[in-house]
């Protein structure tokens, strides 16, 4: 990397223990700093947030009276981006503000009056503020679409298209994604692509446990009794999630689900308790777990074999973040599931190990 980081960032890096750039951070830095339109693809847990934030903040610092807009598919991810951005931006004199659906619009309008250089939010709320003429897109030089594949899945792309329509014709547009499950030529033509989706996460170990379908909750209970164990458990269905939560709590296991009817505020409380190790198991579906970012999470458990290899990779990336050690355990109930799991492992070049743990 040619560009030298500001002294303030070098000091902050030492404080945070940020020692070296990951591959995606290294490869995105100069193109983003130069203002290129770019698609960056890298698995979950490889440092994509800082990969686009650091060069974009430096570029913004040099361009007075301009703004940076970051769109995320959900409130949790937007909040996490804001927290990271605030840490790095304020040391070089830049101010971020957060704009979420479900939060007080009046307060958000008051924040805009303070003239923040960085706007972070969900597409729906950002578009509402544009229509109210509270956000003036003529000042936005760079738009970053984080977890772009999820923005497509959530059908928020129509908001994104309307937002970009209001931006200056020569604005910089950056797509960040964990997968490439979309037609790039159709959606992001003539865009510089840096695709590290095949990057191996060698710091994550992968196991499977063969268990009778009726004993899967018992297996979770047994794992929860392992000393210092803490795991994020993924379910393919809400009905299995609800049933498992009820059975685990009945047996005094500290397990809580991110149910769809949990409001944003309480959801944040649950996540904080899990991060603080006050909960042993956090139960979720892929949809409910979007935006979860827990740096020190050591284990992901698949209650069911995921539907496809990309889902498996996305779940696995919740652990072993930024080079830390992690492991994934998948519960397998019959031979066809094991065959499917081994196919995922072959596609992703993962070493899959059988972990025997018998229910007593």
Task: Kindly label every feature range from the protein language model.
Residues 1-360:
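Conserved helicase RecA-like core
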């Amino acid at each position: 990397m040619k560009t030298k980081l500001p002294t303030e960032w070098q000091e902050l890096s030492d404080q945070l223990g940020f020692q070296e750039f990951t591959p995606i951070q290294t490869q995105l830095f100069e193109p983003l700093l130069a203002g290129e339109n770019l698609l960056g693809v890298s698995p979950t847990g490889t440092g994509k947030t800082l990969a686009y934030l650091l060069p974009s903040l430096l570029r913004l610092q040099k361009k007075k009276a301009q703004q940076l807009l970051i769109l995320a598919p959900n409130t949790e991810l937007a909040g996490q981006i804001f927290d990271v951005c605030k840490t790095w931006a304020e040391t070089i004199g830049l101010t971020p503000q957060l704009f979420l659906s479900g939060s007080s619009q009046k307060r958000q309008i008051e924040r805009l009056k303070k003239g923040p250089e960085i706007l972070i939010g969900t597409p729906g709320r950002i578009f509402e503020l544009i229509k109210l003429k509270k956000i003036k897109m003529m000042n936005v030089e760079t738009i970053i679409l984080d977890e772009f594949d999820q923005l497509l899945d959530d059908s928020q792309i129509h908001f994104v298209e309307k937002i970009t329509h209001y931006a200056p014709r020569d604005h910089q547009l950056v797509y960040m994604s964990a997968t490439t499950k979309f037609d790039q030529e159709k959606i992001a033509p003539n865009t510089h692509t840096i695709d590290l989706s095949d990057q191996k996460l060698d710091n994550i170990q992968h196991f499977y446990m063969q268990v009778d379908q009726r004993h899967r909750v018992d297996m979770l209970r047994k794992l929860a009794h392992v000393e210092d164990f803490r795991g994020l458990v993924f379910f393919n269905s809400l009905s299995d999630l609800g049933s498992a939560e009820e059975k685990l709590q009945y047996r005094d296991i500290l397990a809580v689900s991110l149910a769809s009817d949990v409001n944003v505020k309480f959801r944040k409380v649950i996540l904080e308790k899990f991060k603080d190790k006050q909960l042993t198991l956090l139960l979720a579906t892929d949809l409910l777990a979007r935006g979860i970012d827990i740096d020190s999470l050591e284990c992901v458990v698949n209650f069911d074999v995921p539907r496809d290899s990309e889902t498996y990779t996305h779940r696995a990336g919740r652990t072993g973040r930024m080079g830390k050690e992690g492991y994934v355990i998948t519960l397998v109930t019959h031979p066809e599931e094991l065959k499917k799991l081994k196919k995922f492992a072959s596609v992703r070049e993962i070493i899959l190990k059988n972990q025997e743990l018998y229910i007593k």
